[in-house]
Amino acid sequence: MAKIFFYGAISLDGYLSDVNDGLQWLFDTEVGDKLTTDAFLDTVETVVMGRITYEEARKYVQPLYPGKDVVVFTHNTNFDVQEGFAVSEDPVDYLRKLKEQQSGNIWVVGGMNLLKNIIVADLIDEWWIQIAPVLLGNGKRLFEQSDYQTRLELIDITQMKQLTELHFRRPENKKDSPSL
């Protein structure tokens, strides 16, 4: 059975992107040569994202995740995905099936519309969150208000120059996890 991961960066005040879905603030952050991205990608078979995230990622990354299955969730059944394929069914149902059917891990890239439902459904097994020392003040938050109170375990902290990565996992046995 696959695991579902979130791996992504936020501003210090919790935003995934600015008000225009832009990520330039992240690309302007000095990270040095200790990036964890390549090692993380080696653990992933399928990359999942929403349409807006797909369009933004293609502006910065070409080719987009070579050697990985790329799934783009969109309500537009005519949306042309250059690398990967479009899916218009419910993301939570789709990911539950995919998690059971494949052995390779699944990376949920974003965006917020997709992530919110996946977080509420408690499908993410591990989190890698990079925090950039930038205050955006507005934009799309990683965590919106909702009903998803969950206790996680800290696995590791990695410093990449100006970026700090926190790696968490959901406890294997929720009965043994500390209460909130």
Summary of predicted features, one role per range:
Residues 1-180:
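Enzymes that bind and transform nitrogen-containing heteroaromatic metabolites
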